[in-house]
Amino acid sequence: MLLLFGPLLTAAPALAQSSQHRTDLLDLQLGTAAKDLPEEAFIDFACGTKGGPPAQAIGGFTDFAKCAPEITGLHEVAFRQDDELEYRLLAHHDTSGAQTNGGTKVSAYPALISALFDDQGILRGLRAVSDGRIDLRDRTNSFQMAEAVRIRYGADGWSCIDLPPGNGEEPIATQFIKQNCDKTTDGMLIHTEARLLRRAGETEINRDTGRLVQGQFESSARIDIREAGARLDAMGRPL
């Protein structure tokens, strides 16, 4: 990073230092009150939709009660990482640094992120789903977010299951990934899902024209973190 800034370093040492790490979803500690979370590190707070696009806009974590509870009674608050650092880096013509520090990411992969609060405003869960709106080249690697999170929490101690293909699901070339993993550590139950496959009806070659079809595949990841001992739904995800 020092080489990227060159002569600008003497004028902006704080910028170089701050670009080393942005507060992200996985920095948030379960059991923390909403009022004590680093709200300044995030923007665009809204009610979550179980990992989908944001719904009603809200002012911050402490507005969790404005979001309807899920079946578990928890309130999902979606948000994005603050993008001020990205724009500051761009202003200094550091496109590489801006790319690294830009967007909302989990372990360097673009993601939709949210936090789950109980009625008392205590953080009880974290959720991340790979962002399918990104360009095709980046989306190809989205499934790797699950492995990156597993590495972050330690490569050992994971229980993983490779699920069989569902109806109409096929490999991409020779690759078929449909894996769920779980680990309990430091009072947390961490659940990851990785998918790399073609769904029913998706193809690489248009059978009528013989032309290449782009984007017809699933490459995705999902992360759910709850307190150890959390109940699971029918799909094995923590509730």
Where are these regions (language model features)?
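Bacterial N-terminal signal peptides
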Residues: 1-10
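A low-complexity, Ser/Thr/Gly/Pro-enriched, surface-exposed linker/loop concept
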Residues: 63-90
